[in-house]
């Protein structure tokens, strides 16, 4: 099966559909010709969306960086799908992956207990909880590379 993403006028993914590998292209079946323009044209005609663009996406991430999802952006210059920005403070790195302004914590567990780590956009820092009773809350100290109990 082949997967195609429908893009709006800003190259934002609206939906992803699955079509058969047996669709004909000028080079043979679609299943043997990834990213063939004839697959895009077929989707446009079949789904009656001549004003929108279609791009094939790889379920196994074999091409176009990653599998497209609703809200992803297709970067035509780089020929890849980029996930939505998770937080305003994050920026794309050289691989087009979103990175927080503070590196992800290097300590993810203590004494065999894993921290539940999340990004706090309001304070621009990593926070965590453990699964003790009562739950402990922590802030990541990016300089000392330790968790501080708060």
Where are these regions (language model features)?
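Viral virion structural and adsorption modules
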Residues: 1-150
